Each structure stands twice: as structure tokens, then as C-alpha cells.
């Protein structure tokens, strides 16, 4: 069987800088709790990490939204916290509580991390990627992903989600050497993880820096831009031709510097980014992806239709991938997603 060329995959064409009408579309968390078939598979798996680490089921939930909506890209079903789990930290997902980790408290904890075990321990994830590469439609692109080092570090230091990131920030300010040592481990482990995903069949990579926006400018440069830039350059050098999308959520005006200094091929915009500014300032630098508010997808109706039109009118004249500003939320009606796809793909 011949491998489809990238020119047959609109998502990859857009990331290569082409302007397409209609633009390619996929949605963050397109495999998720809003789909009844996902909830059934999740129940079959038991725990959330069991679902991530069971290739047959992870392939199934990745394919479920493609069957309904024929998105232009599939994204590996996994979680950013499989990386800390693979390098030696306990990770659990508790109902109503989110992720719970055994927090790092010392330099000794950092030095005890085991990045050399990552590939072996994440073998099931790479098996999922291989399964998806052979199962997705020929015009659908396969996205691999990881959390950015800063965002993953916050979970490892805070022990889970945080309102103020006081522990992680205190490591930056009062224990800079220890924090830098942790980030070095995560930069190396993340690069290794993404290269292994590419080798298993991922055709593009997205790096999620969910908590990028909580850092002041100086720290944003040091702990968001520099690590993602290093990972992006390593991927470009070692696996040329595989595009990288950065998603520094909440970066504000620093989005421009982020694009220029990391060398990403595409950038995910959160819902707060002004569209006219993005079209004028960001789109000449790289492909932009986003950025409808996920709650408008819950609302549906005229408000959603107006938002889709605004996005297409403003960003549709350059390299653009339609997406949300963050992930689909569980209360989203599946029929609203179908309507969204129809709107994006309607002749203009």
C-alpha cells in the first residue's frame, strides 16, 4: 500500500504554509467525555491511565471522533503526565480531583528521576501511534504531542493542578539551580518522547504549554521560549520535515516573540488572542491554529455561527487551521460539533 503524500493531507499542507479554503479543522480534546462512545470505552478501561496505556482502547477512542466528524487530523489519545509517570513519579487521576502526583521536594528527587527508562515504559503509547498510523484515513494527519517542560514541571512540583503556582515559582526564584536541573531532565525526556512518537508514525507534533501565561516576561523567555525552542530545533534537526505546533496558552503579546524565537511551524492561539492582531502580526510568521472559545461550542446556534464566520473572515486568507482556544469541554452537545464542521467546510 502506498503511503499518502503530504499534499493529500490538508492539515500538513496548511502547516507547510499553504492557504486552503476551506481550512483544515480538528479540535483539541476531540476524543473525550462529550462523546457517549468515549464514556463507554473509558468505563471499559477502568482508570484513565489504563485507557492511555492500553493500545487497543487508546486507538479506539482516537478514532471515535473521526468516524463522526471526519476531522482533518487525529491526535494521539494520551496525557501530558505520562512523561513524569514514565521517569519515575507516581501519577493518579482521581474522580472530581484531577491529576494527583507525588510532588518533588528536593534536588535528590530530581536526581532520582529516570529519563533513560522513558522509551521502555511508554512502549504502549508508541504501539498506539503505530496502530493509528495504519488505521486513520489516507487524508487524515496524525498528531503526536507532549506537555511543555514548564507545564509538566508545575504538576511535578505542585503535586497536581494549582491556582497560583506558588511552589513552582518559588523553585524558580529561590532554588534556581534545582529548577534548572529539573527542566534539563524534562527537555531531554520530552525530546526523546516526541522523536519516538515520530518514529512510530506521528506526522506532526504539538507541544502544549497550558500554564505558559502565568509567568512574567523574563521567566517566560527562560522557561517557555527557550525549552520549546530547544525541543523544536532538535526535532527539526533529527526528524526534518515533521512540523511542530507550539501552544503557549495565555502568552498574550509574547506570542510574536515565541514564534520568532522557537522556530515553530505553527502556533495554537487561545481564545483571548485578538483575531485582527493575529492576522497582521502572527500569521505572516507561521501557520495559526485556533481559537474559538470552547464554551461557544457548548452554546451553538447563532453565536457559534458568528464566531466561526469571524474566524474564517479574519484568518482564512492565510495559512490557518480551525480549532478551539482550548479543549472541548464535557458538556458539549455532539450535534454542535457536527454543525461546526459543516460551517467551516461550507462553500464560501
UniProtKB/Swiss-Prot annotation:
Residues that bind substrate = 29-33, 79, 155, 210, 326
Q: Please, which domain of life does this record's source organism belong to?
A: Bacteria
Name any Gene Ontology BP term.
protoporphyrinogen IX biosynthetic process from glutamate
The parts of the chain that form a coiled coil are: none
**Record keywords: DNA repair included?**
no
Pathway membership, UniProt:
Porphyrin-containing compound metabolism; protoporphyrin-IX biosynthesis; coproporphyrinogen-III from 5-aminolevulinate: step 4/4
Keyword 4Fe-4S among UniProt keywords? no
- Give any Gene Ontology cellular component: cytosol
Name the EC number(s): 4.1.1.37
Q: What class of enzyme is it?
A: lyase
Which positions, given as ranges, span the membrane? Answer: none
InterPro entries the record matches: UROD/MetE-like_sf, Uroporphyrinogen_deCO2ase_HemE, Uroporphyrinogen_deCOase
Q: Where is this site: Transition state stabilizer?
A: 79
A Gene Ontology molecular function term of the record: uroporphyrinogen decarboxylase activity
* Keyword terms: Cytoplasm, Decarboxylase, Lyase, Porphyrin biosynthesis
- Where is this gene product found? Cytoplasm
Subunit structure as annotated in this protein's UniProt entry: Homodimer.
User: Family, per the entry?
Assistant: Belongs to the uroporphyrinogen decarboxylase family.
**Function per UniProt:** Catalyzes the decarboxylation of four acetate groups of uroporphyrinogen-III to yield coproporphyrinogen-III.
Its name, as the record gives it, is: Uroporphyrinogen decarboxylase
Q: Which gene encodes it?
A: hemE
Amino acid at each position: 500500500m502506498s503511503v499518502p503524500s503530504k499534499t493529500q493531507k490538508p492539515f500538513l499542507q496548511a502547516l507547510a504554509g499553504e492557504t486552503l479554503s476551506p481550512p483544515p479543522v480538528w479540535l483539541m480534546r476531540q476524543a473525550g467525555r462529550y462523546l457517549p462512545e468515549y464514556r463507554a470505552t473509558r468505563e471499559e478501561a477502568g482508570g484513565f491511565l489504563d485507557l492511555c496505556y492500553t493500545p487497543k482502547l487508546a486507538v479506539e477512542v482516537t478514532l471515535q471522533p473521526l468516524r463522526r466528524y471526519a476531522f482533518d487530523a487525529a491526535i494521539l489519545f494520551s496525557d501530558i503526565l505520562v512523561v513524569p509517570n514514565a521517569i519515575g513519579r507516581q501519577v493518579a487521576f482521581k474522580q472530581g480531583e484531577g491529576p494527583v502526583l507525588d510532588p518533588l521536594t528536593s534536588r535528590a528527587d530530581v536526581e532520582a528521576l529516570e529519563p533513560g527508562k522513558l522509551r521502555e515504559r511508554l512502549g504502549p503509547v508508541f504501539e498506539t501511534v503505530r496502530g493509528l498510523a495504519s488505521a486513520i484515513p489516507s487524508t487524515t494527519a496524525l498528531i503526536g504531542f507532549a506537555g511543555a517542560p514548564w507545564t509538566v514541571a508545575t504538576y511535578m512540583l505542585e503535586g497536581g493542578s494549582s491556582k497560583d503556582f506558588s511552589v513552582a515559582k518559588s523553585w524558580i526564584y529561590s532554588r534556581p539551580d534545582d529548577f534548572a536541573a529539573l527542566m534539563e531532565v524534562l527537555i531531554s525526556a520530552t525530546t526523546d518522547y516526541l522523536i519516538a512518537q515520530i518514529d512510530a508514525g506521528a506526522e506532526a507534533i504539538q507541544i502544549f504549554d497550558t500554564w505558559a501565561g502565568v509567568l512574567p516576561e523574563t521567566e517566560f523567555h527562560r522557561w517557555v521560549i527557550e525549552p520549546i525552542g530547544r525541543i523544536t530545533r532538535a526535532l527539526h534537526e533529527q526528524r526534518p520535515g515533521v512540523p511542530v505546533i507550539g501552544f503557549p496558552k495565555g502568552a498574550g503579546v509574547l506570542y510574536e516573540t515565541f514564534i520568532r524565537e522557537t522556530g515553530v511551524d505553527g502556533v495554537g492561539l487561545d481564545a483571548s488572542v485578538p483575531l485582527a492582531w493575529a492576522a497582521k502580526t502572527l500569521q505572516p510568521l507561521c501557520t495559526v491554529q485556533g481559537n474559538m472559545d470552547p464554551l461557544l461550542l457548548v452554546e451553538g446556534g447563532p453565536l457559534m455561527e458568528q464566531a466561526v464566520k469571524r474566524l474564517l473572515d479574519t484568518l482564512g486568507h492565510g495559512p490557518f487551521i480551525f480549532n478551539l482556544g482550548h479543549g472541548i469541554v464535557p458538556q458539549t452537545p455532539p450535534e454542535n460539533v457536527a454543525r461546526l464542521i459543516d460551517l467551516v467546510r461550507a462553500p464560501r
